[in-house]
A protein has these predicted regions:
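Transmembrane alpha-helix segments characteristic
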Residues: 14-20, 76-79, 241-244, 386-406
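Membrane-interface alpha helices of multi-pass inner-membrane proteins
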Residues: 202-203, 237-260
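Hydrophobic, aromatic-rich transmembrane alpha-helices
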Residues: 52-54, 341, 345-388
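Short acidic/glycine- and proline-prone juxtamembrane loop motifs at membrane-interface regions
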Residues: 206-214
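Membrane-interface helix-loop-helix junctions at transmembrane boundaries of multi-pass membrane enzymes
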Residues: 176, 181, 231-237, 277-279, ...
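Transmembrane-helix motifs of polytopic, lipid-linked glycan transferases
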Residues: 55-57, 162-182, 374-378
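Transmembrane-helix signature of polytopic, membrane-embedded enzymes
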Residues: 158, 175-197, 392
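Membrane-interfacial entry segments at the cytosolic side of transmembrane helices
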Residues: 63-70, 233-240, 272-289, 436-448
Length: 468
């Protein structure tokens, strides 16, 4: 992608955000965002588009080792600075070291409590607590991880966040490897640079929730699966490591593990014969099915059945919930209406009535809304270029995860969409590096529709509460 085109897309990205924010703030001036949230959002949008535009042209022609070093160390420096900044910012503005009194505080309190019992040698209490006072296997992973850190390093919150910063920085390298092998060097480098400056992947390092670890495990698992098949190096470690990562992923969110297994099956089936011959496909599929059955007859399997039984039968859950608390237009939250916007939703909240966490990341949410066009276009380009087989691992994972999220009661939650963001960056980078002039017409139309959709989304939030 040329430097001129990079700037062109960045200008549109910034312009659409500022226009939408201005129109919404004027139209709903009694409910406009406070100045601090506006500045947060503007800062997030400018940070991503301006720095991506500056650094991608500078780094795109470096030799691979030099590129890796720059990506990792710049990403790590940014994330370490944000961890320290957010620590004091939350303390000053929220009264404690968390962005909101939600899940992060709960995970912290439980893990600190368990670490005290471990130091006393009371392992029986710890096992009993994890078994009886957590929400199933998918709630165990993060709690055990935090408990381990607090046992070694004490009750401070910074150590866990420093590890998040390290994971987030290395994630940029993992994204580069996966994107480069799938779509080529240009795409891999652009995806890595966007990953370095993607605000939400930075902001998650300053939050005490499990999304950063979950994202890291899932993308690393995909990269190792991709390496296993493309390298044809079927060593013990190359086979066991992806299985281990999938197992760990189940400990953070059940659907992540399910989608990883599904994506690998699709990738193997659709791989051309020069990658996996017929005999290799039979062996690989047999091993994958065997691993799946092992998972199925454990606590993981019980949760998979619960996911299927409750989530997919409860696609109208949010509509009923909104109606029960007196909100209007709950009908529109049904999955059949939301599913077509799986890549785009949820849209950025630009009104004061949104939760604090959502206002804090509303600029990041907008960037995802904007890049969703290129992610969707990537599917068209892959088919157009007859590269859909190369795209099968990434596509199967992303589409299956988004489909599950959109057909459950989590379809409106930003947090549940965050694991999809790294692959949206990969897909967007692929589309941007293979744009045709004709594609820009669709891009202009999308920018206009996005402005209208942002206005309608925020109006709907106010109208549902009877405020407009």
């Amino acid at each position: 992608m040329s430097k001129k085109l990079t700037r062109y897309i960045a200008i549109y990205g910034i312009g659409v955000y500022l226009l939408a924010l201005l129109v919404i703030s004027i139209a709903f001036r009694d409910h406009a965002l406070q100045l601090r949230w506006m500045l947060w959002g503007i800062g997030e949008v400018l940070f991503f588009f301006v720095l991506t535009t500056i650094f991608y042209p500078r780094w795109k022609n470096d030799d691979p080792k030099s590129f890796w070093r720059k990506v990792f160390w710049v990403a790590l420096a940014i994330r370490l600075l944000y961890v320290l900044f957010s620590y004091f910012y939350f303390e000053h503005n929220m009264g404690f070291h968390f962005d909101s009194p939600g899940d992060g505080v709960g995970y912290y309190n439980r893990s600190v409590r368990l670490s005290r019992y471990i130091r006393r040698g009371d392992f029986g209490y710890v096992i009993d607590f994890i078994r009886n006072y957590s929400f199933g296997y998918s709630d165990h992973g993060y709690l055990i991880w935090l408990t381990f850190l607090h046992t070694l390093f004490g009750r401070g919150v910074l150590v866990a966040r420093l590890f998040k910063a390290l994971m987030s920085a290395y994630l940029c390298i993992v994204v580069y490897k996966l994107a480069s092998r799938t779509f080529g060097e240009r795409t891999g480098r652009l995806a890595a640079v966007m990953c370095v400056f993607m605000p939400i992947l930075i902001q998650l390092t300053g939050m005490h929730v499990k999304e950063m670890e979950m994202i890291f495990l899932s993308i690393l698992a995909l990269e190792r699966m991709d390496f296993l098949i493309r390298s044809k190096k079927y060593t013990f470690w190359n086979i066991v490591f992806p299985i281990l990562l999938v197992g760990l992923s189940f400990g953070f969110r059940t659907v992540i593990g399910m989608c990883l297994i599904f994506a690998f099956l699709v990738f193997v089936i659709l791989s051309p014969s020069n990658l996996v011959n017929r005999k290799g496909k039979i062996i690989t599929l047999s091993i994958t099915v065997a691993v799946f059955l092992v998972f199925l007859f454990t606590a993981i399997g019980s949760e998979m059945k619960i996911i299927y039984r409750i989530n997919f039968s409860g696609t109208d859950y949010m509509a009923k919930r909104y109606e029960s608390i007196g909100l209007k237009y709950g009908e529109l939250s049904k999955s059949k209406y939301l599913f077509p916007g799986a890549f785009v939703l949820p849209l950025s909240p630009m009104i004061e009535e949104a939760p604090v966490h959502n206002k804090l990341i509303h600029g990041s949410t907008y960037i995802k809304n904007f890049l969703a066009f290129f992610a969707m276009l990537a599917i068209v380009i892959a088919i157009r270029q007859k590269r859909w087989r190369d795209f099968s691992l990434i596509g199967a994972y992303e589409l299956s995860y988004l489909a599950i999220i959109m057909f459950t009661f989590t379809s409106n939650s930003e947090r549940f969409h965050e694991p999809a963001i790294p692959l949206i960056l990969v897909m967007a980078a692929y589309a941007m590096t293979h744009l045709r002039r004709k594609d820009l017409v669709l891009f202009y139309v999308y920018c206009g529709l996005l402005c209208i959709a942002l206005f309608a989304w925020n109006w709907l939030k106010l109208a549902a509460r009877g405020l407009v």
